[in-house]
Amino acid sequence: MRTPMSDTQHVQSSLVSIRSSDKIEDAFRKMKVNETGVEELNPYPDRPGERDCQFYLRTGLCGYGSSCRYNHPTHLPQDVAYYKEELPERIGQPDCEYFLKTGACKYGPTCKYHHPKDRNGAQPVMFNVIGLPMRLGEKPCPYYLRTGTCRFGVACKFHHPQPDNGHSTAYGMSSFPAADLRYASGLTMMSTYGTLPRPQVPQSYVPILVSPSQGFLPPQGWAPYMAASNSMYNVKNQPYYSGSSASMAMAVALNRGLSESSDQPECRFFMNTGTCKYGDDCKYSHPGVRISQPPPSLINPFVLPARPGQPACGNFRSYGFCKFGPNCKFDHPMLPYPGLTMATSLPTPFASPVTTHQRISPTPNRSDSKSLSNGKPDVKKESSETEKPDNGEVQDLSEDASSP
């Protein structure tokens, strides 16, 4: 005859055995065996009474490690197959569109969408020399074909061919031939320059085209940049471009086709910067292509860094120069400018500092300030300032005008 005490002891012993078996089973579950046969314990804490760590359930990792206060179950759900240094596969979840477009995911293992391995988009994407993706199965990017750049960058889903194979028709730009240019060390340089047609500019300004750098040729992937030098003219009223012929060629191409009418007021943006972002559609007047060359500098020019994957520098893309120089954190692609001739030999680094500025008109006085305010210099008056008399001596007309 069993006593009640013996029954309770039997029940307690059975419960203890069940608990011990559960603990043993949990211990086997926690223990992982790798390929070498050595056991590996779960590096994250197991807290049965706490909530499950959502970050661990999504990615299989936890940034807090052993200090996390949530539970980290040993067996992850079946729809999460995480591999170290790879993007997670989440079967049943929508496909990650960013991953299908670029082959990468900026969210990494924290992305909650599915990243299939057998998709074509998961393969490494080829990039052109500017840093834009080339997708042979997609149609060409219309914005890239017009402007030569793409504001979406690596996230664009369209095809971006190589610049020497593409055609850019923005602001009258056409396709650009390739030339064989080399460094002084013998390395082949990416050449996308052609011959520059003579721009139509007022007679008061003589454009002088020089090599992209007045001391050395920049390496491939770096854009030419000339350090700012002192100019004898006001920057606001007479903006000049850097010593880079690439920026000067860009200015000539951008200003090509701008309307010049005396009936309309002057375009303030054009007067301040020398270019107009509206192009032919601008309704204001653009008084000539104002390009002046700064005095030559004996300091070697700096170069702007090319940072593929970063947004393009707005100043460099619009005007051809960057005020931040080599410290700029944005991308400065070596864009192909049409009509640019680059010197194949290195110029002398120590040039003569005694040079004359390219402006041939004298300093304006009060009498001709009215003509200059309209943006059109009085060519007739400037040409009649000096004349040669019969005796060969130079006669100043200003003295004759003051005499009775």
From Swiss-Prot:
Coiled coil: none annotated. Keywords: DNA-binding, Hydrolase, Metal-binding, Nuclease, Nucleus, Repeat, RNA-binding, Zinc, Zinc-finger. GO terms for molecular function: DNA binding; mRNA binding; nuclease activity; zinc ion binding. Residues 350-404 are annotated as: Disordered. Its EC number is 3.1.-.-. A zinc finger (C3H1-type) spans 47-75, 90-118, 135-163, 261-289, 307-335. Residues 377-391 have a biased composition (Basic and acidic residues). It is an enzyme of class 3 (hydrolase). SMART domains: ZnF_C3H1. The keyword Nucleus applies. GO terms for cellular component: nucleus. PROSITE patterns: ZF_C3H1 (PS50103). It holds the Pfam family zf-CCCH. It is found in: Nucleus. Residues 350-374 have a biased composition (Polar residues). Possesses RNA-binding and ribonuclease activities in vitro. PANTHER family: PROTEIN PHOSPHATASE RELATED (PTHR12506), ZINC FINGER C-X8-C-X5-C-X3-H TYPE FAMILY PROTEIN-RELATED (PTHR12506:SF79). This is Zinc finger CCCH domain-containing protein 3. It comes from Arabidopsis thaliana (Mouse-ear cress).
